[in-house]
Amino acid sequence: MKMYDYPAPNAQKVKIFAYEKEISIEYIPVDLINHELRTPEMLNKNPMGTVPFLELEDGEIIRESRAIIEYLEGIKESPNMLGKSPLEKARIQEIDRLAELGLMIELAHYVHNISPFFADKGPQSKEAAEMALNCYKKNLQILEDSITGDEFLIFDRPTVADCTLFSTFTFAESIGVEDQNGFSKTMAWYKKFGNRKSIETEK
């Protein structure tokens, strides 16, 4: 298998997930700056022009990080990272969606409204950036109150929620947002999970 990727949260969470599952993938870096995704060869593989996407041995293409994760879970059930029972699946999804929709999306809104890189891609608003950051902080408190695990966010093993949240915090630090420092359980988890081989290898 090959995964075409670029250093960004969605690709990072898939890499962490794959390492925790002990699934071997060849990673192919894509040059986004020079619009490699818009070349005929790449658009033939993925008309959406996005990364990451997974190319199987038979040429099948799987787009979108969540679809890739579902596929990887399906081809190697152990260790289970999406939930063993209906309740486990629901609890994992709660945290995973909070990390993605409550934190990652707010960070994206924030950076799109303050970064000079996006200045020519649409109107920017300091008020919108501040609102996004406030929502991020509010959702961090919800996350803090939701952590029930010690080494991991929930249960006694890594799940997709750990992968999503770690990649979210990596992105937050890259854009200078470190408000998570005030949340003790969250930061204790972040430090422990950051020492795992899946993180060291991904770096």
Annotate each PLM feature.
Residues 99-194:
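GST-like fold's C-terminal all-alpha helical module
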Residues 54, 66, 136-139, 198:
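Aromatic-glycine hotspot motif
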Residues 201-203:
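Short, flexible loop/turn segments with low-complexity composition
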Residues 1-130, 151:
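GST-like domain detector, emphasizing the conserved glutathione-binding G-site
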